[in-house]
Amino acid sequence: MFKKALFILSLCPSFALAQSYVVYDFTHNRVLESHASDSIQPIASVTKLMTANVFLENNKNPNCRIAITKEDTDRIKGTGTKLPKNIPISCNELLKAMLVHSDNYAAHALSRAAGISRRQFIKKMNEKAHQLGMYSTRFHDSSGLSSYNISSPMDLVKLAKYSLNKSDIKRLSNLSATYIQAGKQKLYIKNTNKLVRDEIFDAAVNKTGYIQESGYNLVFINKHRCKNATIGVISLNNTSSAYRSSFTKSKLEKFGCTALNGRTIRDVAGEAQYEDGYDEVGFNTLIQKLSK
């Protein structure tokens, strides 16, 4: 079993897995602080920011609806979904599930819902990256489950800045929790980012990401100005969800951002239940399948 696990990991692309980050002033377009900010690493569910942009720009049907099917199953990491299968769901609700709760099945369904094929959708994601000058970025799927979805903190600055132009992304980024209407079901979901979920900071743009190959990632732009500037922190390959939260908070505060009502980070022990993407359960499931 252990040898099989090592074999699986050997199939993943090789990257310099160390934390990289940039603290960026989006008002004056300047780097405030950084470390290895051009380092290329897997970005996991941060991918969904590009998925949202491409969907919003290509979907021409305001009443778009699509069902989650077998086609949307996670065959890479073995993650599940709260969303019911084979029931038409509003694309607006799927967008909410994807950006707030980082639902992978919703991301896959949205890549089929914009009137183009999934392959064409991924092509448009890569074309948009090139258009934005994200030359170190590549996308292989719409969810970020593939470890071949790669980027750098500086490339992600460009995606984050572009996302500020999308009112839907800005609105959904800052939802601490919400309901998803799926047929007759009403599903309660929470934000995968503790800083937003616990209302420590308000977000203008916010997307977490995690697979084992990437570590814990975050693109976060503070909603409120910090000393007359809009400040964002983008970090890849943090060692844990708790560290990602505390690191982001410390950098925001260092450059003049204030936590809402002086709030602090608490109760980090239960963080894993909110994390998106590739978890240990999914990894063990994958090993078991390949060992048969």
UniProtKB/Swiss-Prot annotation:
A Pfam entry, by short name: Peptidase_S11
Enzyme class of the recorded protein, top EC level: hydrolase
Keyword Transferase tagged: no
Annotated binding of substrate, by residue: 207
GO cellular component, one term: periplasmic space
Active site, per annotation: 45, 48, 102
EC numbers, comma separated: 3.4.21.-
InterPro entries documented for this protein: Beta-lactam/transpept-like (IPR012338), Beta-lactam_class-A (IPR000871), Peptidase_S11 (IPR018044), Peptidase_S11_N (IPR001967)
Signal peptide annotation: 1-18
GO molecular function: beta-lactamase activity; serine-type D-Ala-D-Ala carboxypeptidase activity
Domain of life: Bacteria
Function: Cell wall formation. May play a specialized role in remodeling the cell wall. Specifically hydrolyzes the DD-diaminopimelate-alanine bonds in high-molecular-mass murein sacculi.
Protein name: D-alanyl-D-alanine endopeptidase
Organism, scientific name: Haemophilus influenzae (strain ATCC 51907 / DSM 11121 / KW20 / Rd)
